[in-house]
């Protein structure tokens, strides 16, 4: 099983089994693989597969997948429908990402996915379960909500965040928040737009540090 990265290093022996059980432990009802048979041509011909170019079952990948299947069959449906219930959530929104990436004038170093990962990584390393949810989802069951680069504020989000904080939740905002509405139009009256009262700040100017 290969990663599909600039350097496609193989997963170490037992690593696939480990991350498969990790997924199941976090609520996954199925573990699926792409692809069954390795392609013979085109750009993905070296992409990992269960059945490799050799065409038989005499390789580590096939054996490890077969072992996992045997083990999961023994477990059966005992874990189906089980769910982890984290108390921490990170808001991540694709429209927000596209709007940030489509804007010019501040800094090309603004990186929405990386900003989210900077919050996720230490939580993961500390074994703190985290849900990654859309900005318009229900926040009532969380104790901590992190909203990295909440540049776009969709309808209902302001009220939802304010209610979450009033109910005792802890909200973490980062740079570049509250700038536009759901149509990527700047909310006039001062940054951070609809989140001014919630954040308790008014941003007069933006500036960017050079690398």
Give the label of every model feature segment.
Residues 1-211:
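Carbohydrate-binding surfaces of carbohydrate-active enzymes
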